[in-house]
Amino acid sequence: MYYYLITLAVIALDQLTKWIVVQNMEIGQKIEVIPGFLYWTSYRNDGAAWSILEGHMWFFYLITVIVIGIIIYIMQKYAKGKRLFSISLAFILGGAIGNFIDRILHQEVVDFVQTVWGNYYFPIFNVADAALSVGVVLMLVYVFVDDRKTKGIK
């Protein structure tokens, strides 16, 4: 059940960082953290990643509730004893709930992490988005490693 602690930690860190941004920054304000690479940029997003489906909150409520239910079911039924699998699900669950809290309370998500690679500005994101991404990468690693074990590949 340690994976639920990971989920709670992700939610707490996500909500704390968003609260700090809302309390201390104006929308659109940018603070340079690492020159030419990392900025805190206060932004609100009423869509999904990269502002996909902006303005369709009902869709996000429905999908998020379904995803949260499925993840909790899978964690309870299949994750026990599978460390990497359960950790990946914990990150995904924490990220989903973190952004869901914003959508329920504010009908938008607070984003603030902005990275720049040369002339490319990566879309602004938050801790929940990062947790979702980490969870998906860990899940892919788990699937790849588990597949290799199943097939007996070293």
UniProtKB/Swiss-Prot annotation:
Subcellular location field: Cell membrane
Protein name per the record: Lipoprotein signal peptidase
Catalytic activity: Release of signal peptides from bacterial membrane prolipoproteins. Hydrolyzes -Xaa-Yaa-Zaa-|-(S,diacylglyceryl)Cys-, in which Xaa is hydrophobic (preferably Leu), and Yaa (Ala or Ser) and Zaa (Gly or Ala) have small, neutral side chains
Listed InterPro entries: Peptidase_A8
TM region(s), chain numbering: 55-75, 84-104, 124-144
Primary location recorded for the protein, binned into one broad class: membrane
Record key words, sorted: Aspartyl protease, Cell membrane, Hydrolase, Membrane, Protease, Transmembrane, Transmembrane helix
Residues annotated as the enzyme's active site: D111, D129
BP GO annotations: proteolysis
Pathway: Protein modification; lipoprotein biosynthesis (signal peptide cleavage)
